[in-house]
């Protein structure tokens, strides 16, 4: 979870993981690094220009964007393997509220298991184990 723990008052940049129950969005993956098992979630390949806007001044705040962008954004295509598999957690999704927090994902953990900037991180083994059971109706509860 996030370095600042779990919060029901999540704000952009506070390093906390939002408290609540949320739907799951797209499964993003690095086709060059991961062979996907069967999965019922909608999928999208991460390309070199795939990003996620974390700049509340943008109309694309908390949405996938194409890089480069004049606004701040997380790059999803990384040297690190933490985003080889990621699922968008639908926090601050509909409607999007400026500065309430963005880019909350279920993704792979670092080897060191260090805290995230607000996401949920699990091992690749566990991610691949749960993936076949996830679908559009699946919810994640964070408490």
Enumerate the predicted regions with their spans.
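Cell wall/extracellular polymer interaction/catalysis modules
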Residues: 1-117, 124-143
């Amino acid at each position: 979870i996030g370095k600042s723990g779990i919060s029901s008052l999540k704000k952009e940049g506070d390093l906390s993981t939002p408290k609540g129950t949320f739907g799951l969005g797209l499964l993003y993956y690095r086709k060059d690094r991961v062979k996907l098992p069967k999965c019922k979630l909608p999928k999208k390949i991460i390309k070199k220009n795939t990003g996620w806007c974390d700049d509340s001044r943008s109309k694309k705040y908390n949405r996938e964007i194409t890089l480069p962008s004049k606004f701040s954004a997380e790059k999803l295509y990384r040297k690190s393997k933490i985003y080889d598999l990621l699922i968008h957690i639908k926090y601050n999704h509909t409607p999007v509220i400026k500065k309430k927090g963005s880019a909350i994902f279920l993704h792979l953990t670092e080897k060191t298991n260090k805290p995230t900037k607000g996401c949920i991180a699990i091992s690749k083994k566990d991610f691949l184990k749960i993936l076949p059971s996830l679908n559009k109706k699946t919810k994640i509860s964070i408490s």
